[in-house]
Structures are given as C-alpha cells and as structure tokens.
C-alpha cells in the first residue's frame, strides 16, 4: 500500500514539475480529436450550402411537383379516387418538404359562339375551354363584375336542357378585348359528336387579371388568361368556372367531354438538405412508378430528383480535397504530439529508472 502511495506521489510531483509539456500534449490531443470529429460536420455544412445554392438558382416551378392526368372523363367519383391516391403517395413519400398544394383542371377545346352577333366560321371560328383553379380568388384582381358562383347541385335534365340555362364564368381582360365582350355578355360553347353534341351558355360575370403573372401559383403557364396567337388565327377564350360547376354540369352537357387534371405540390427548398436528399430522390422515383401503375396515362414532372443526382455527382469533388486537408493537418498534429511526448519521456527517464 505504501509502495502504491509512493508511486502516486512521484507521478504527481513529476507531473507538476513538467506541467508545461504535459499541458502541451493534452492540448494537442484535444485539438486533434476535435478536428477529426468535426470534419464530418464541416463536410455536411458545406454540402448543405452547395445543395441550397443549386436549388436557389433553379426555377422554383421546375422543382415543384406536378402530377398530371391528361384526357380523362370528368367524373366526380373518379376524380376523388385519383386525388386520394395521389395524396396517399405524397404523404407516404414527400409530405415533409411540401409547403403548399393546389389543383388545376383544363377542359377540352370547344367551338365558341356569340349570342349577340354572327360568329365567324371555318378557320376563323372562335374556340374556348374551361379552367378550374383552387384558391383562385387569392391570386386574381377583379377588374369588373363580381366573383363567380357555382351552378346548383342536383339540377334536373329538364333544367339542364332549358335553352336559357347558363353557368357563370370569368374571363381575362385581354381575352375579353379579343372577343369584344364584357360583364353581362354571354358566350356559347359547343362540343361533342353525334347524339352527344351539345351547347352550354356561359354568362360572363367578371373580367379578371392575375395579381402577379409570374407568381409560382401559375406554374409558368403563359396562356392561363389569354392564349398567344397570330393575327390570322381565331381567338381562344379560357373561361374560369368553379369546381362544383365543372362536376355538376359539364359531364351531363358533354357526355364525351374530357379534361386534363393537375395536382400541384410546391416544394419548400429550405427543408431539402444533404441528409435527406437521397431519401427524397428515391421517394420521387418510387412515387412516379406507383402513380403510373395505379393512374394510367398520368405523369409526374419535377427536376428535383435530377438536381439531387447532379449534386451527388459533384459531391465527391468537394469532399476529397476537404478530407485530404483535414487528414494532413491531423497528421501534423500527431507528429507534433509524438515529438513532444518523446521530449517528455527523455526528460523523465531518470525518474522512471529510479522508480
């Protein structure tokens, strides 16, 4: 017992006598450990900055997800089933990075007719289509008139076939000028073939413009309010109607009528980082396959997975130099520690031999 106490006394005395060298060794060890342990954290921080920079310099609408189902019959039940399927896939795969979602429906093209004057025919025959946007009121300015109302549900066949029956719609300013119509005027859309050919009258209750034509809400579409055309082309009228009107009236007036359905999901790029990038990429590809299997002719458009692949391909070119520098510094510190330790051992060699 006394021998052990004597040994500890010698250790304490010699440590106090050589505290400068021992402190140097201890500091060197701490620095080496801290440097090596922080290298992965520093690497992740650089990776996050690189990915964030890449995402911020891309067009956000191309990063957002657009699920589209073209040329589908307009059927409320089928639409609800498709929406539930898409929502299930989104929730299962990428919900954490989604900050907003909207829907957009665009009908097939119809022949358009005036009710107060002759309508040009042949190659100059005006045309038009219906559009439905969720939360439209938050993104438009009503220049004249009032916000549209939905056609009542449960309309009878007699009511629908009434020659005076009409639905309410809104039209863009530029399109209204092309058609020379205003609030209170009517347009008639005609479509279908054979026995299913029919006409639907639209009362224009508002002339509208987008609050911001470049808003992400419009998904880079430049023909929402007016369709660009040449001077020799007939005008086309995009008419905005409510979703209730679309499903309550459209399928009965145009039994063969079809539309393209779009589900839009806006990505929060702040929630995409180097840690979850691989998971997001795989989730998008998995979701695309599942939708194509369960929703025929549908598609998923986004460049987010391509950006992640491109980012991962460039990643090693930044990681390799970083880790080479870190290991070089760590090697220098270790060399320094070994040198100082040898000096300390040489200095205390006499005491160790005596002990």
Predicted regions span which residues?
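Membrane transport/envelope proteins' first extracytoplasmic loop
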Residues: 1-331
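Interfacial "coupling" helices/loops that link adjacent transmembrane helices in transporter permeases
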Residues: 46, 335-355
């Amino acid at each position: 017992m006394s021998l052990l106490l004597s040994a500890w006394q010698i250790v304490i005395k010699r440590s106090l006598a050589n505290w400068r060298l021992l402190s140097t060794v201890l500091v060197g060890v701490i620095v080496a450990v801290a440097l090596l342990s922080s290298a992965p954290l520093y690497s992740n921080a650089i990776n996050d900055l690189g990915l964030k920079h890449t995402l911020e310099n891309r067009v956000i609408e191309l990063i957002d997800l657009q699920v589209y189902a073209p040329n589908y019959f307009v059927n409320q039940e089928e639409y609800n089933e498709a929406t539930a399927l898409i929502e299930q896939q989104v929730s299962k795969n990428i919900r954490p990075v989604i900050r907003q979602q909207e829907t957009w429906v665009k009908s097939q093209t119809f022949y358009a007719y005036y009710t107060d004057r002759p309508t040009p025919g042949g190659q100059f025959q005006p045309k038009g289509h219906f559009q439905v946007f969720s939360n439209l009121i938050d993104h438009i300015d009503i220049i004249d008139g009032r916000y549209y109302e939905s056609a009542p549900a449960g309309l009878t066949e007699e009511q629908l076939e009434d020659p005076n029956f009409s639905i309410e719609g809104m039209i863009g300013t530029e399109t209204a000028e092309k058609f020379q119509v205003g609030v209170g005027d009517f347009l008639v859309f005609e479509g279908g073939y054979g026995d299913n050919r029919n006409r639907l009258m639209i009362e224009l209750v508002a002339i509208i413009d987008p609050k911001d034509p470049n808003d992400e809400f419009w998904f880079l579409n430049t023909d929402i309010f007016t369709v660009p055309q040449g001077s020799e082309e007939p005008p086309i009228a995009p008419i905005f109607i409510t979703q209730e009107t679309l499903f309550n009236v459209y399928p009965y007036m145009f039994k063969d009528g079809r539309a393209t359905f779009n589900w839009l999901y806006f990505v929060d790029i702040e929630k995409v980082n180097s840690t979850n990038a691989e998971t997001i990429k795989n989730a998008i590809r998995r979701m695309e396959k599942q939708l194509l299997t369960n929703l025929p002719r549908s598609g998923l458009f986004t460049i987010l997975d391509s950006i992640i692949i491109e980012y991962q391909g460039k990643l090693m070119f930044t990681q390799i130099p970083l880790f080479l520098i870190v290991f070089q510094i760590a090697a220098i510190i270790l060399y320094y520690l070994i040198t100082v330790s040898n000096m300390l051992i040489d200095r205390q060699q006499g005491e160790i031999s005596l002990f």
